[in-house]
Amino acid sequence: MGLTRRLRPEVPMHLLTCVPAVCALGICRGLREAGDADACVRWPSDVILGDGSLICLGSHAGYEEGMYVDLALSLEGEGADPDLLERAVGWALGSCDQWEARLRAAGTVAGPLAPVLEDYFDALEGSNQEVDVVYPNGRVAASGVLAGVDVWGRVTVRCDDGREMDLAPEMGRVRPRA
């Protein structure tokens, strides 16, 4: 089951890249406030519920009568509550509105996640814990501790061999170490 919503945040185009992450953070916050203390964001922008269900966020940005981001939400998992997606959309839109207001109030920011960076990192699955870095082909590239995220949404893993590895979403994913 899924839903799609068009968002038109009034922010500079280069800041739109993090809209899915900002929306995932809002959904995670909403779930936690609703009693799901184990909800977390799977980097970069999916949300894991405490029961193991997953809210997947996808996006497509474009320009048609102004800039937009189409945000697609889908719910995966047995026993998933279909009404949850509607509530998730509300949480996502509210988070995007708050983010937009904070960007506007700040004037100039280092990057799109700057206003929510600490909250986003704290919500990430595996933050400050041992993780594997997995390439798109499924090969484990490195193991270490998920040490940070930057204002553009790239994660930093402090590898077991002492080096630091920065990872953009298109380069792979991180998962808790088995």
Please state what every model-predicted region is.
Residues 1-8:
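Primarily the active-site beta-strand->alpha-helix module of PP2C/PPM metal-dependent phosphatases
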Residues 8-39, 49-178:
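Long, positively charged amphipathic alpha-helical accessory segments at protein N-termini or as interdomain linkers
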Residues 41-45:
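Short Gly/Ser/Thr- and Asp/Glu-enriched loop/turn motifs at secondary-structure junctions
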